[in-house]
Amino acid sequence: MRVIVTGGGTGGHIYPALAIAKGILAQRPDAEILYIGTREGMEARLVPEAGIEFSGVSGQGLPRKLSLETLKVGGKSFKALWETKQILKKFKPDLVVGTGGYVAGPVVLTAALFGIPTLLHEQNALPGITNKILTRFVRKVMVTFPESIAHFGVQKKLVLTGLPVRAEIGNISREKGAEDLGLRSDCLTLLVTGGSRGARSINQAMPTVLKHLAGRKDIQVIWATGKATYQETLENLKAQGIQWQRENWRVLEYLKDMPEALACADLFVGRAGATTLAEIMVAGKPGILIPYPLAAENHQEFNARALEKDGAACVILDQDLTGENLWALVQGLLEKPEKLRKMAQAARGLGQPDALNKIVNVCLDTAWK
C-alpha cells in the first residue's frame, strides 16, 4: 500500500498529516508513505525529522489582495501541478490524503483528476478555502467539528472523525501530572498558554490575575508565556512588583509537559486553534478561550464558539480582553465547582479520543490496496 499525505503552511496542517501517516504505518507496517509539501515551508524540516519520506514542490499562500504577487503565486501553483504530476507517476499511490493549506490544493486536485482515491481532513469549525474547493473532487471529507458540516456542499461525503491528539492526552492521572510538575494534586489548578509562540494579549492580562491570586495557596498556576514574549513578560511582572517565583506557580517559557499539565488542570485559558481544542476536549477541561484575531477567515472564533455553544467554554474576544475581565471569568469559574464540573463533562462529551483510528479506518477503506 502506497500513500501520499500532504498539508502545509502551518503546524495546524502539518501535525495532523504526520499523525495520519504514523497511524497508517501502525496498522499497516508494510505501507510506503510519502509526504508532499513545499520546499520553503515548516514541513520541509519537520517531516524528515519525524522519519517520513518528504518530497518538495513549489507553492505559496495567495495574497489577500490582487496584485503582481498574486500572478507570481498563481505561476507557482501551476508549477506545483506539473511537479505533482511527475511525483504521482513515479510513486503510483493507492491513496492521497490532504489536511489543508495551499500545498494540498494542487496535490489532491491532480491525484483526483488522475482517478486516484483522495481524502481530505478539515481541522477547523470553519473550513479553509482550499478544502471547500476540493470537496467536489475527493471521495470523502473527514471533519473535526460537527459545525463545519454545514459549510460543505456535498453532505454525503462528510465523516465526523475528530482530530488526532497525542496518546498521552487524557491517559495521565491527576496525581501523576501534578507530581511531574512539582505541584499538588489537591489544589485547584489554572493552566494558561498562548501556544509555542505565545500570545501577547494574554500575557499582558495575566499579571492582574496573578495579583488577585498572590495570597491564594489553594490555587496553582501553570503559565506558559511562549518563547518570543518570555523575557518581556518577566520584566512586566517585575515592574508591577509581582513575585512570580512561588511554590504554587510555574511561569514558563514553553510547556513541554502539556499532557501532564492538562491532567492536573481544572481550567484552561488560551487560544482556540484546532489542536489545542481537540486536546482540551479529550482531556475534559473547561476553557476560557481567546481566539487569535488574525487567524485566516477568523476560524479560531468559529472553533471557540462551537465549544461555547455546547457549554464547554467561555469566549473573550482579543479586542475585549483586559486583566480584570479575565480575572472575573477565572474567579467566577474556579469558585463554582459545580459549573466547572458541568463544563468539564461537556468538553469530554465533545472529545474524540479515538479520532486517529477513525481516520485510519477511512483511509484503509478508501485506498485501492
Curated annotation (Swiss-Prot):
User: Per its UniProt record, what Pfam families does this chain match?
Assistant: Glyco_tran_28_C, Glyco_transf_28
What is a biological process (GO) this protein takes part in?
cell wall organization
Question: Which residues of this UniProt protein bind UDP-N-acetyl-alpha-D-glucosamine?
Answer: T10, G11, G12, N124, R166, S196, Q300
Where does this protein act, in terms of pathway?
Answer: Cell wall biogenesis; peptidoglycan biosynthesis
All disulfide bonds of the chain are none
Catalytic activity, per the record? Answer: di-trans,octa-cis-undecaprenyl diphospho-N-acetyl-alpha-D-muramoyl-L-alanyl-D-glutamyl-meso-2,6-diaminopimeloyl-D-alanyl-D-alanine + UDP-N-acetyl-alpha-D-glucosamine = di-trans,octa-cis-undecaprenyl diphospho-[N-acetyl-alpha-D-glucosaminyl-(1->4)]-N-acetyl-alpha-D-muramoyl-L-alanyl-D-glutamyl-meso-2,6-diaminopimeloyl-D-alanyl-D-alanine + UDP + H(+)
UniProt-listed InterPro entries: GlcNAc_MurG (IPR006009), Glyco_trans_28_C (IPR007235), GlycoTrans_28_N (IPR004276)
Q: Does the keyword Transferase apply?
A: yes
The compartments listed are:
Cell membrane
As recorded in UniProt, its EC number(s) are 2.4.1.227
Topological category with respect to the lipid bilayer? Peripheral membrane protein
**Assigned GO CC terms:** plasma membrane
Keyword Membrane found: yes
Q: Show the GO MF annotations.
A: UDP-N-acetyl-D-glucosamine:N-acetylmuramoyl-L-alanyl-D-glutamyl-meso-2,6-diaminopimelyl-D-alanyl-D-alanine-diphosphoundecaprenol 4-beta-N-acetylglucosaminlytransferase activity; undecaprenyldiphospho-muramoylpentapeptide beta-N-acetylglucosaminyltransferase activity
The record's principal subcellular location, in a coarse class, is membrane
Protein keywords? Cell cycle, Cell division, Cell membrane, Cell shape, Cell wall biogenesis/degradation, Glycosyltransferase, Membrane, Peptidoglycan synthesis, Transferase
Into which EC class is this enzyme placed? transferase
Please explain the role this protein plays, according to its UniProt record: Cell wall formation. Catalyzes the transfer of a GlcNAc subunit on undecaprenyl-pyrophosphoryl-MurNAc-pentapeptide (lipid intermediate I) to form undecaprenyl-pyrophosphoryl-MurNAc-(pentapeptide)GlcNAc (lipid intermediate II).
Q: Which family does it belong to?
A: Belongs to the glycosyltransferase 28 family. MurG subfamily.
Give the protein name, as stated in the record. UDP-N-acetylglucosamine--N-acetylmuramyl-(pentapeptide) pyrophosphoryl-undecaprenol N-acetylglucosamine transferase
Q: Say which species the protein is native to.
A: Desulfitobacterium hafniense (strain Y51)
